[in-house]
C-alpha cells in the first residue's frame, strides 16, 4: 500500500521536513508515505492542474479541507486497515493558501478535515503524517497511541 501526500508549498521550514521525515521513516515498507510538493501558483485552478498530474494512477483521493468531514484517529486506523486489505493506494491532497480548487474536491472520493481550526499547509502536512503513523501503531498494538 502506498500513501501519497500531494501538498502545495515548497521550501518548507526545516522543522516541517524534520518532523515529516521522522514519522515517514517509522512506517513499514508495505505502508510507505511519499510527499509530492507542488509549487504554489497564482490561482487554485492552475494549482489544480499540477495537483491532478501528481496523483498516482488508480489511487483513491481524499481532499483535505476545513469544510470536510471530521475524522477520529480510530476511524483513520479502521480506514487504513481496510485500504490495506483491499489493496488500495491513497492520495491525500493539501491545498495552498487559497485551499483546493473545487474540481479537486468534487473528484475526490472523500473530503476530510484534520481540525475545526484553519491550519497552515505546513502544519497540516506534519499533522497528517503523524496521524497516519499513529493509525498504523493502533493497528499494530504499538504503545505509541494511548487512550
Swiss-Prot record:
Catalysed reaction equations from the record: pseudouridine(1915) in 23S rRNA + S-adenosyl-L-methionine = N(3)-methylpseudouridine(1915) in 23S rRNA + S-adenosyl-L-homocysteine + H(+)
Primary subcellular site in the record, as a coarse category: cytoplasm
Pfam family, one: SPOUT_MTase
One Gene Ontology term of the molecular function aspect: rRNA (pseudouridine-N3-)-methyltransferase activity
SUPFAM superfamilies xrefs: alpha/beta knot (SSF75217)
Role of this protein: Specifically methylates the pseudouridine at position 1915 (m3Psi1915) in 23S rRNA.
NCBIfam families given in the database record: PRK00103.1-4 (NF000986)
Protein name, as recorded: Ribosomal RNA large subunit methyltransferase H
Source organism per UniProt: Polynucleobacter asymbioticus (strain DSM 18221 / CIP 109841 / QLW-P1DMWA-1)
Lineage of the species this protein comes from: Bacteria, Pseudomonadati, Pseudomonadota, Betaproteobacteria, Burkholderiales
Gene this protein is translated from: rlmH
Amino acid at each position: 500500500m502506498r500513501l501519497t501526500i500531494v501538498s502545495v508549498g515548497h521550501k518548507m521550514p526545516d522543522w516541517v521536513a524534520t518532523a515529516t521525515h521522522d514519522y515517514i521513516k517509522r512506517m513499514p515498507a508495505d505502508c510507505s508515505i511519499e510527499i509530492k510538493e507542488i509549487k504554489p501558483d497564482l490561482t487554485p485552478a492552475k494549482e489544480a492542474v499540477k495537483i491532478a498530474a501528481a496523483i498516482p494512477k488508480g489511487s483513491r483521493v481524499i481532499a483535505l479541507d476545513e469544510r470536510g468531514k471530521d475524522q477520529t484517529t480510530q476511524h483513520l486506523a479502521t480506514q487504513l486497515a481496510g485500504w490495506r486489505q483491499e489493496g488500495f493506494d491513497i492520495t491525500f491532497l493539501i491545498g495552498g493558501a487559497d485551499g483546493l480548487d473545487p474540481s479537486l474536491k468534487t473528484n475526490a472520493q472523500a473530503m476530510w478535515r484534520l481540525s475545526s481550526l484553519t491550519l497552515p499547509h505546513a502544519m497540516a502536512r506534519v499533522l497528517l503524517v503523524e496521524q497516519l503513523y499513529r493509525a498504523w501503531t493502533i493497528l499494530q498494538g504499538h504503545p505509541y497511541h494511548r487512550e
